[in-house]
Amino acid sequence: DGFEVLNVMERKHLIEDIPVIMISSEDSDVYVRRAYELGVSDYISRPFDAKVVYQRVFNTIKLYAKQRRLSTLIGDQIYEKEKNNRMMITILSHIVEFRNGESGMHVLHINRLTEKILECLVQKTDRYHLSYSDRYLITTASALHDIGKIGIDDKILNKPGKLTKDEFEIIKTHTLIGARMLEDMEVYKNEPLVKMAYQICRWHHERYDGKGYPDGLKGDDIPISAQVVALADVYDALVSDRVYKKAYSHEKAMEMILAGECGTFNPLLLECLVDIQDTLQE
């Protein structure tokens, strides 16, 4: 019957996009109320006037057309805002990379790696309850992971040789510098993107066994956003040329990460890295 059709449409989320007008000889309040609860746009009881029905159908279609145009307009505006956000984040992160003597590809690589790892993770488990919006925010905010390096002395940042213990302690402060920069943005600090970027900036050098920095967080006390970006950052650092080292091959980088030479990572994320490794060299 009509209610069964409405139930099917609701289960398949069709009722949100297709206007439904129900015509029935039933006119009890319970019957009509149930129809509206299931998502009908209008309810017409028999007997009816054909001209009135025509006008109500016409008005319903006209209303849905307006709603669709409005949704498209809002969608376009949101897209433009997100595009501008991404552009400004990319520009800012490239400034940091330029100062760090890098090519600018690191941010792009981190972005793509983060996206791929997250895609794999949500297929493996719902443990972290990551929505599409969450994954988008993490991927976008990943570009700002090293923004704190803008506060580190060039001589240390671009030193070709091994860092001294004191120099390494200074380098480690880039996590706190980046987090503080974002925290100091009073107007925007509660924006979801800024809050996500804060997590990543501060904790992308933490390790799953608690031996990372700056706070020595352990396991899932480390936000999953920072865990994912940490793994992406380590892999890309290994396979890229740096002022202090030559690039390792993909095979060697994977061997080092899986052997724990770069710290301990979430086993689920390591599984994801292995699963997507065929696409990594692209």
Regions found by a protein language model. Name each.
Residues 59, 66, 70-88, 99, ...:
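Amphipathic coiled-coil signal-transmission "stalk" helices
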Residues 3, 86, 97-282:
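Metal-dependent catalytic cores of enzymes that make or break cyclic nucleotides
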Residues 14, 26-30:
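Negatively charged, flexible loop motifs adjacent to catalytic sites
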Residues 30, 47-57:
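C-terminal output helix
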Residues 3-16:
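Short amphipathic alpha-helix used as the core "switch/output" element in two-component signaling
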